[in-house]
């Protein structure tokens, strides 16, 4: 498969001018040229989901652009990289998408949550837009599905059910759909509510004989975004009314997006018919972000705040807060506030005691590991991360890789990057060799322990 092609490059340039930036970045840019023979343009996409979406929504657009460039009829076909790699054992064919996108703003029209566009005020968080969402392996599927329903509501995934733990970005994605929808269609009626609000509105309407107004509020919308649906648990009458609301919107072709901390089948005391309705579209889960995604989130937040954070500080914060994004961003905010109030520099040494009192004296960064190892074995840091195969250097490098794996939260590929761009398999081999020697070679065991003592990484939480 060719990495690039002049014709496809020109077609992409033309499409970039004619499509919105989110659409181009999400669907067109990831497509790679495969071949162009006898008027047949074959493109490779990251996965089945992208292939299907391009085929249904962009085939004609791409063909017209290609015909304009080539001067003759062109037919486009899409092949999934997933299928090419024979990766058919994946549990979900839409679980991998290379998506980068942007979006904008929104307005809604009724009561506190459904407001007229001209009022400029609304209940959706202005920060919760697609361009501020950092996509990682943990959230690619959910992000792609959210963008898909934002672009074409009521078609592919209805309802879209986003599930995941607290603080992982469910509400962000849900509200981003609302922002995007009204940016595309200013007259769209978008309603975002929590399940508790839905239940409270229902109770109030019953007490005040206002069911007509209640039904009008919830069933006249084009897009219903309902958060924390797990709170329907055990509320029989609320479930009954939500079932009716769901059916009314679905039958009218309106889009429904639901968020929950668990899949529909795991919500206790939820009616089977609701479980069935919630499962008839797409269930997309969001997992906790890995270290690389957490670092990307912090970097993006720093850029938004126009701050320049040292890489080792970003690594430190990302390594200490791994459970959810909310805690991660809270730690960033505290670090910035602390530095501002005290006048101390934004460094690991100054920020660590505030974020993690137990980390005083045991903060380990990749640079520190490399320095301690190079000093201990009396080789230069440059030589340690080089490709030198001299035995003293290669042995020191293997121990350095082992200690970096033990003392930091970096993945194998990232450790390889720290050691001059080594492949992750090289890092894995080095770690395995050191682990074997620890039990068979007292000299190596002593060397490793001495450097550990210098770094004080035995007391770190991940050991």
Swiss-Prot record:
In residue numbers, the region (Domain I, interacts with DnaA modulators) covers 1-84
The ranges of region (Domain II) come to 84-122
Assembly and partners?
Answer: Oligomerizes as a right-handed, spiral filament on DNA at oriC.
Q: Where is this region: Domain IV, binds dsDNA?
A: 340-463
Subcellular compartments: Cytoplasm
GO MF: ATP binding; ATP hydrolysis activity; DNA replication origin binding; lipid binding
Instruction: Read off the lineage from the record.
Output: Bacteria, Bacillati, Cyanobacteriota, Cyanophyceae, Synechococcales
Known function: Plays an essential role in the initiation and regulation of chromosomal replication. ATP-DnaA binds to the origin of replication (oriC) to initiate formation of the DNA replication initiation complex once per cell cycle. Binds the DnaA box (a 9 base pair repeat at the origin) and separates the double-stranded (ds)DNA. Forms a right-handed helical filament on oriC DNA; dsDNA binds to the exterior of the filament while single-stranded (ss)DNA is stabiized in the filament's interior.
Q: Which UniProt keywords apply?
A: ATP-binding, Cytoplasm, DNA replication, DNA-binding, Lipid-binding, Nucleotide-binding
Q: What is the protein's name according to its record?
A: Chromosomal replication initiator protein DnaA
A Pfam family annotated for this UniProt entry: Bac_DnaA
Give the residues the record marks as binding ATP: 167, 169-171
Q: Which SUPFAM superfamilies match?
A: P-loop containing nucleoside triphosphate hydrolases, TrpR-like
GO BP of this protein = DNA replication initiation; regulation of DNA replication
Instruction: Enumerate the InterPro entries for this protein.
Output: AAA+_ATPase (IPR003593), Chromosome_initiator_DnaA (IPR001957), Chromosome_initiator_DnaA-like (IPR020591), Chromosome_initiator_DnaA_CS (IPR018312), DnaA_C (IPR013159), DnaA_dom (IPR013317), DnaA_N_dom (IPR024633), DnaA_N_sf (IPR038454)
Q: What is known of its domains?
A: Domain I is involved in oligomerization and binding regulators, domain II is flexibile and of varying length in different bacteria, domain III forms the AAA+ region, while domain IV binds dsDNA.
């Amino acid at each position: 498969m060719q990495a690039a092609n002049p014709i496809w490059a020109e077609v992409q340039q033309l499409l970039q001018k004619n499509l919105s930036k989110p659409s181009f970045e999400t669907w067109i840019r990831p497509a790679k040229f495969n071949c162009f023979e006898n008027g047949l343009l074959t493109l490779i996409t990251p996965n089945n989901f992208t292939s299907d979406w391009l085929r249904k929504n962009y085939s004609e657009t791409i063909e017209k652009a290609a015909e304009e460039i080539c001067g003759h009829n062109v037919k486009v076909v899409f092949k999934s990289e997933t299928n090419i790699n024979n990766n058919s054992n994946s549990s979900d064919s839409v679980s991998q998408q290379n998506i980068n996108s942007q979006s904008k703003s929104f307005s809604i029209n009724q009561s506190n949550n459904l407001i007229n566009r001209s009022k400029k005020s609304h209940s959706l968080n202005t920060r919760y837009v697609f361009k501020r969402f950092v996509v990682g392996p943990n959230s690619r599927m959910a992000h792609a599905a959210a963008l898909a329903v934002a672009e074409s509501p009521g078609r592919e995934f209805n309802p879209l059910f986003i599930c995941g733990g607290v603080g992982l970005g469910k509400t962000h994605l849900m509200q981003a759909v609302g922002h995007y929808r009204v940016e595309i269609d200013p007259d769209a009626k978008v309603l975002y509510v929590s399940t508790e609000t839905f239940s409270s509105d229902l109770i109030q309407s019953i007490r005040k004989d206002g069911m007509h107004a209640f039904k009008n509020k919830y069933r006249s919308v084009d897009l219903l975004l309902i958060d924390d649906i797990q709170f329907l648990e055990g509320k029989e009458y609320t479930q009954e009314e939500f079932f009716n609301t769901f059916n009314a919107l679905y039958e009218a072709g309106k889009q429904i997006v639901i968020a929950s901390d668990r899949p529909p089948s795991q919500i206790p005391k939820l009616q089977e018919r609701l479980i069935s309705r919630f499962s008839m579209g797409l269930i997309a889960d969001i997992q906790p972000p890995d270290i690389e995604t957490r670092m990307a989130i912090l970097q993006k937040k720093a850029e938004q705040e126009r701050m320049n954070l040292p890489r080792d500080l970003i690594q430190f914060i990302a390594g200490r807060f791994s459970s959810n994004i909310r805690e991660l961003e809270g730690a960033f905010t505290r670090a910035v506030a602390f530095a501002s109030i005290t006048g101390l520099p934004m460094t690991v040494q100054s920020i660590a005691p505030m974020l993690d009192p137990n980390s005083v004296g045991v903060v380990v960064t990749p640079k520190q590991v490399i320095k301690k190892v190079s000093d201990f074995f009396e080789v230069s840091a440059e030589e340690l991360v080089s490709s030198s195969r001299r035995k003293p250097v290669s042995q020191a490098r293997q121990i350095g890789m082992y200690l970096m794996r033990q003392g930091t939260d970096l993945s194998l590929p990232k450790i390889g990057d720290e050691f001059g761009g080594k492949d992750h398999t090289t890092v894995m081999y080095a770690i395995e060799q050191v682990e074997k020697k620890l039990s068979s070679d007292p000299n190596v065991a002593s060397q490793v322990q001495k450097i550990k003592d210098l770094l004080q990484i035995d007391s770190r939480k991940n050991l």
